[in-house]
Structure formats: C-alpha cells, structure tokens
Amino acid sequence: MKNTDERYSMATCCAGGQSLRSKYGERAPNIQLSDRQWPSKKLTKSPIWLSTDLRDGNQALPNPMTLQQKWRMFQLLVSIGFTQIEVSFPCASQTEFDFTRQLIETPGATPDDVTLEVLSPCREDAIATSVRSLKGAKQAILFLYLATSDNYRETVLQLSEAEWLDQAKRCVEYARSITKDDPENCRTKWSFGFGFEDFANARPEAALRLGETIKTAWGPSKDNPVILGLATSVEATTPNVFADQVEYFSRNITEREKVCISIHTHNDRGGAVASAELACLAGGDRVEGCLFGNGERAGNLDLITCSMNMFTQGIETGLDFSDLLEIRRVYEEVTNLPVHPRQPYSGDFYFRAFAGAHQDAIRKGLAKRGRLAAMPSGLTQMSKGMIINGTSNEKIPSSTWRVPYLPLDPADLGFSFDSVIGVNSQSGKGGIAWLIQQGLGFNIPNELAAHYSQIIKKRSVSLERGLAAEEICDFFLEIYDLKSSYNTQLLKRLHSGFSQTIDMQQELEDATAPANNAAMDISKTMGIDVHCTMASSHVISSHDGEQLSNVAFVQCEIEQTTPCVWGVGVALSREEAVNRSLLLAARRKPGTETPDTKTSVNAIIQPLEVYSFSQKA
C-alpha cells in the first residue's frame, strides 16, 4: 500500500498512454492583466438578456421543436419579459425560415419592444437567406459568427490569420450593404452582432484585431452599438480567467461606447453562471443563455439562475419568474426535457428542507420575520409586494429577507410554503409542527410535536419514502381521532373557502387546571383512572379577531401506566374542546398511537376533505 505522498507523486496515465499534464495541462491562453479591475467591482444593474432557447436550445434537443412548439416557446419568452430573442438559424432548414416569417407576418405576434435575432454563418449565401427571413421586421439583429481561436481557425477553417480577417470584413460589409444601407430594407431598425466562437481559447490580440475589423466594417453608433459576442463555446478555464479575457478586450477595443459586449457561456465545467457574472463585472453588457440551462453538451447558461442570482441581490432584472412552476411546465412540455429536482430556484427540492435542524431554523426564521401570521394554508400568491388571500390584503414586512436556509421568499417564484418542509426519517418535530400549523391551524405544543414526529418517522421508514404535507395532516387527524363526523364538519367550516385568513400565531394557553377537574369527572363516569399531566389550548380565529373555534391538547396517564397518551379536541368552546380531548385520550390505551403502517409505497394520497378549501361546508 503506497502512502499519500507516493500516490500523488505518480503521474496519472490517460487514455493513449499520455500523462495528465501533457494531455490537458496549459491549454488556456496566457493573459497578463496584473491591474485587473473586475475583482473590486460589484454588480449593481442587470445586463441585457438574450434568450437563445429557440436556437442553441432547440438545436440541442434530440427532437427539435415543431413550428407549433416554437410558437409556444416564443410566447412564453415574451411573457417572461425577454426583449431580445434569438429565434432561428434561417439557412439551416425551411422550418427555421418559415418560423421567422410567421413571427413577422402574423399581426401582433411580436410586441413592439421585442427584437428578433437570427444567427448566420459568416458566408454571403447564408447571410442573404437570413436577411430575407427578417424582411419587414420592425427591428432585428443579424448575428454572424466565426471561429476565433488559432485551433479552430487552423483546424476547421484552414485559413491564415490574414485570410480570416478578410473573410470577416467581406461578410460584414456585405451584410451592411443588404440591410441598413439597402433602401428596400431601411424600414427595419437593423442591429448587428458578431460572435467570437471559442473566444475563451483565442489569443487576446487576435480577438482584438477581429473586433476592430468588424466595428469598422459595420459602422456602429452610440445609439446603435455593434454587438460583439465573447463566448466560452466549450468551457475550458476557471471563471476568473474568462473575466480577465473579457476585461482585456473591453479595455482595449477602441470606441468602447459603440460596442455592446455580449457574454455567451457554456456549462462544460459547471461554471456557466459564475463565468457570466464575473464577465459582467469585467465589462459584459449582454448575457445570452437558455431557460433551465438547456443547450449542447452540459448546456448553456441558465438564464433563470443567473437572473435570480441578481434578483436576490436586490437588482431589477426585467424578467418575471413569479410563476416559475408554470414556466417549468410549459418548458418541459415543449422540450420533453425534465428539470432536475436540485436545479437552482426551479427544482422541486430547491426550497425543501428534510433535516430536522434545518426545518426548525426555517420555522424560527419565518416566525421572527412575522410571516407565519400572514401565511394561509395552501398556495400563497404574490402581487405587487402584497400577500393576497381571500379578502385579506396584508403588507409584507419591509425588512431584509434573512430566513435561515431559505435564500429567497418562495412566494416570489410562486411556490407555496408547503414546498419548504419535506418530511422523512431525518426530520424533526419543528418542521412537522409547522406543517400541522399550516395545514390545520393547530399550534401544537412541543411535547405533542415530539410525540407525533416519532410516529411520522416510523411511518416514513415503513413506507421507505418521504411524506407529503397532506399525508402528515391527514395522519394527524387519524392518529388523534379527529375524523369523526362532528370534528370533520367543524374543520370544514373553518377551512372552506378561506373567506378569512386564519391567524397562525395563536398563543397556547395553559389548560391543566380545568382539564384536571374534567378528568376527575371522566374517571368517575368511565370507571378508569384518568390523570391529566399537561393540557393547553388556543383559539382558532381570523386576523380580524373573529373567534372561529377552539382546539385543546391534553396529555394523560391512564390507570397510572406509562407512556402517557395524547388527546386532541376541537369544539366551539374551550371547555368543550378540553372535554373532547380528554374523552379521546381516555379511550386510548398507552402505545396505541401508531396504527398499522402496511401501506403501499406507491399508494396515491387522496386530498383530505379539510384541504378542499374551495368546498363549502
């Protein structure tokens, strides 16, 4: 057995017998930028966003979108707020060309503030086709691209550097002649962009020469700058190296005010978002990407992650992801690609905490913020900074969001707080108590929460899966005998329609004294020894103070045996609620709180009556 030093001193042998260093080492171009400025900067404004879902995203699909699917995706992008959308590669297929024409020729299809962009190779025939596809557009971006690195130029294009620059100059001048300089096309407001394919592996001075050539050939202005796209076509370095490359280009290109630097990153090393963020610090003006990080190989930059990163720093992005679940649904239907449950912001598990310590921290953080009082059971919607629920319209606290383990308010993305807590065998009493509070309006005491959490953990282990919020609430009603006709009707009365917001912040009151008196009466009546060891209750009321009901929680010793049993009672009066909880506890034998858990793992949980909030009692 070799020791650690010996193992790390051995050269790794890659496929083909090459050493690791000779095969992969020192591939990134060397750039000297000792006076770099980007590390000391801070993002304070959003870049221009370009969606390339209909181009880069579409070409990466096993089954490219049909015209109908493209149309649906375009409408989705417009509804989100994208004002620059790359819609096609017109010379690639008739479908691409026809879709572009459909967007232009269909009245009202393209809003006045949306600019269509098409992508074209740096060839005159392809450029001509692309321009024809845009004929009649109110405003359009013609975007060419050309390989920039020596490797691509020599291997793929097989051109010298002089020939390469001449091709770029010739194609840009041709594009200009048939767009903004052509009287027949002058009604369209033309913008022009040029993509530096494999910029991340290009020599900095060569990229600059190409940029100057393009700028001179197009003739941009401050009001209509030329777009120069700097791409990590295949991510090859750490994000800081790419930031240095972008800053070098931004600082050295002449007439910088006439240039819009567009950042196009890929996720081959998992750093697409980080690379784009640092590139914006280094001078990037526009960011290109796809929803949910779709794109070739490991994907393009995820526009949702990048924009929400800025959103959570208080930066207005101009993009609306307040109904992210609906956006995800449309995306998955159109692309036939699933969104990973751990995807930042949009995955099913992004907000969800399973660990007990995390759940407890979230519960306490929300309570401190004062959100529990304003949170109804079920879906919470956001509208202009207000919580809307029935007739209640309460302002959210204006303090900075600081809830442990929740990077942002789930409601800002259209998620309900039911999505925050996930229960499995690792969960603690705090999260379970919170779900009961949200689902049933019961502020259960810590001792009961600890008792019930053990039951839930056993059930989770037995079923070999986590439990949904509705299951946990349903099981609570079953365990504590709250499914009787009387209780069900009362709970339905409390929850039906939610015409009023239930106050989730009701404080527990000690009810031990009245419970002990009632316990003595029950002992005489039933002929068993019932001793109340703990009792509490609280009012279930609306935010405007109307009392709706009472709930009581009692812990009892039956016939002086252990463990103690719990009873929960719901009634219109406190006294009746205490009595009912004692009666339910007295009927129970110690250790019988755990019913048969032989339930199919694949069983579909049916919503409980009390959760049908729209159903009138």
Swiss-Prot record:
Its EC number is 2.3.3.13. GO terms for cellular component: mitochondrion. Pneumocandin B0 is the starting molecule for the first semisynthetic echinocandin antifungal drug, caspofungin acetate. Pneumocandin B0 is a minor fermentation product, and its industrial production was achieved by a combination of extensive mutation and medium optimization. Inactivation of three of gloP/GLP450-1, gloO/GLP450-2, and gloM/GLOXY1 generates 13 different pneumocandin analogs that lack one, two, three, or four hydroxyl groups on 4R,5R-dihydroxy-ornithine and 3S,4S-dihydroxy-homotyrosine of the parent hexapeptide. 2-isopropylmalate synthase; part of the gene cluster that mediates the biosynthesis of pneumocandins, lipohexapeptides of the echinocandin family that prevent fungal cell wall formation by non-competitive inhibition of beta-1,3-glucan synthase. The 10,12-dimethylmyristoyl side chain is synthesized by the reducing polyketide synthase gloL/GLPKS4. The thioesterase gloN/GLHYD exclusively interacts with gloL/GLPKS4 to maintain turnover of the polyketide side chain. GO terms for molecular function: 2-isopropylmalate synthase activity. It holds the Pfam family HMGL-like. GO terms for biological process: L-leucine biosynthetic process. Signal peptide: none annotated. The keyword Isomerase does not apply. Coiled coil: none annotated. It catalyses: 3-methyl-2-oxobutanoate + acetyl-CoA + H2O = (2S)-2-isopropylmalate + CoA + H(+). It comes from Glarea lozoyensis (strain ATCC 20868 / MF5171). This is Isopropyl malate synthase gloH. Pathway: Mycotoxin biosynthesis. NCBIfam families: PRK03739.1 (NF002991). Keywords: Amino-acid biosynthesis, Branched-chain amino acid biosynthesis, Leucine biosynthesis, Transferase. It is an enzyme of class 2 (transferase). Residues 47-325 form the Pyruvate carboxyltransferase domain. Belongs to the alpha-IPM synthase/homocitrate synthase family. LeuA type 2 subfamily. The gene is gloH.
